[in-house]
């Protein structure tokens, strides 16, 4: 445990930030999981696209709050869109 007053404050502040960052990370990870689960359950196109928009917004918010690096956010979105686009292509081929 720190003895100096400023060090004690740094411990309090960093713990508060850690919890806030954890909440943002959990939020956007759950949004991504919702999209992947919708793809797995073969949900309609509109549902998947709506969930994808929400996931994208959650990732962008985490990037803007500096919870994750912008490149990590871009990478996560790219991988998610890759899976969504693949699913949408399979939907189109099955409809024909």
UniProtKB/Swiss-Prot annotation:
Keyword Repeat: no
Swiss-Prot/TrEMBL keywords: Ribonucleoprotein, Ribosomal protein, RNA-binding, rRNA-binding
GO CC terms: cytosol; small ribosomal subunit
GO molecular function: small ribosomal subunit rRNA binding; structural constituent of ribosome
Pfam families: Ribosomal_S20p
KW Secreted (keyword) present: no
Domain of life, per lineage: Bacteria
GO biological process: translation
PANTHER family reported for this sequence: 30S RIBOSOMAL PROTEIN S20, SMALL RIBOSOMAL SUBUNIT PROTEIN BS20C
Record-stated family: Belongs to the bacterial ribosomal protein bS20 family.
Entry function: Binds directly to 16S ribosomal RNA.
Stated name of the protein: Small ribosomal subunit protein bS20
Lineage: Bacteria, Thermotogati, Thermotogota, Thermotogae, Thermotogales
Gene that encodes the chain: rpsT
